[in-house]
Amino acid sequence: MTNKERIEQLIGTRDWGGLTQMLRSLSNMELRRMERVMREEVLPTLENDLFWETLLYIITFKRAAFLSGVVAVRHLAKDGTLNFATESVNRLYEHLRVTNAESIVKMCNMMVPELTSEEQVKGMFEAFHVENEVTRLAVLLKAEHDLSYYLIFKTLKLIEDKVVARKCCMALVKRKDDRAFNAVCLIKAYFGLDDLPARFSLTIEQYELSHIDRNFDTFVHVLEGKRPKI
């Protein structure tokens, strides 16, 4: 039986003591290999509750090795079964809060590019108690998809701070990506930012600004360079 098969068997029976014992028996080289196997082959096969329970135990065993396993959340996000309202998520948050609080934001940074809906992102922030809007913006900037641009815009509207808005724009401009540039155009128009060191082709009329974040589809419509449907 391979190490992967043994791991899958132990996880399937929720034998966490046996899992810990096995991981402790691995050499440094084997543990590094197991980190990849867990992230790429084992965790992506687990249903929501077992996913979070497994992640809790392996991060508790060795945070530095297994924290990145959270990126395997993508299969749950994609099929719509992702749920942060579980006891294992609560316990994982408490464990990180006590042992290494900065890992909470690190984990969110790795997770947010894999999420596919506003509800999922909101659930992540609530479950891991990321309550400060500026911190949320920093996390959202780790993703490079339309959903993150939409939530960045909504968060900036909520806090209404031109300095923060400009910093977000500068971060997006560095991507040299058409979608990111159009997101900057929206932020620039809403906040009246006139000193950004870049040229933009998308123009937004003032009367259109109140419609941009009406819903995600409308926002994406504008990101594509189209006029919002009013």
Residue ranges and their predicted role:
Residues 1-183, 187, 192-208:
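Non-catalytic all-alpha helical scaffold/repeat segments
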Residues 209-230:
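Terminal, non-catalytic domain-edge segments
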